[in-house]
Regions:
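N-terminal amphipathic/basic membrane-interacting segments and domains
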Residues: 71-74, 85, 92-100, 106-113
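Short, conserved catalytic or interaction motifs in soluble domains
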Residues: 6, 32-35, 44-47
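Aliphatic-rich helix starts adjacent to a transmembrane/signal segment
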Residues: 39-56
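Alpha-helix exit/C-cap motif
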Residues: 59-81
Length: 176
């Protein structure tokens, strides 16, 4: 009788169906728990990329304004990064709050020196809070930085939407 119990099956070559179902169920539970966290990390990285792209463009303008060899006229410059439009056109725009087109050209030259492909930068995140509440609450379709250049080369930056300013974790004010 003991010999019968000591005999091993030689045809046991794999897992049983029950074992496979249990493993699949455990994997499904893990995916269900981890997927929302993964999506949060992906969105956070998209926002980080957007904030970094805009911040680098702002720094290019600030450095150009503070540089004694270059001349960035006293003015207010706005850099806006929009969502990718369906036509595939450039989505980053520099505007100047004056009637002098020369100021815009100088700002664009400053950006081109720092980042040659700045005009092709696209908004990666679709979840920037527009700051609106109630029925008008929606996600912002752009992020922007308004850079005011003083006569001495000092700069003040205002970020839009407000959630971008807290994401970059600063309200930049630098001087010469």
């Amino acid at each position: 009788m003991l010999k019968f119990l000591n005999k091993k099956k030689n045809d046991n070559k794999g897992f049983s169906l029950v074992e496979l179902i249990i493993v699949v169920a455990i994997l499904a539970i893990l995916v269900g728990l981890l997927a929302p966290q993964y999506l949060k990390y992906v969105e956070k990285s998209r926002k980080s990329a957007d904030a970094s792209n805009l911040d680098e463009m702002v720094r290019a303008i600030q450095v150009y304004a503070a540089d004694a060899e270059e001349t960035l006229p006293e003015d207010t410059y706005t850099i806006t990064i929009n969502k990718d439009d369906k036509s595939g056109k450039a989505t980053t725009v520099v505007t100047v709050n004056s009637k002098k087109d020369a100021n815009k050209e100088v700002a664009e030259r400053a950006l081109t020196e720092a980042a040659p492909d700045w005009a092709k930068t696209k908004l990666k995140s679709n979840k920037w809070d527009s700051g609106e509440t109630g029925e008008n609450k929606a996600n912002a379709t752009y992020i922007s930085a308004e850079i005011t250049v003083a006569q001495d080369g000092g700069t003040t930056v205002k970020y839009t939407p407000a959630s971008l300013a807290t994401y970059i974790n600063k309200t930049a004010k630098t001087g010469k």
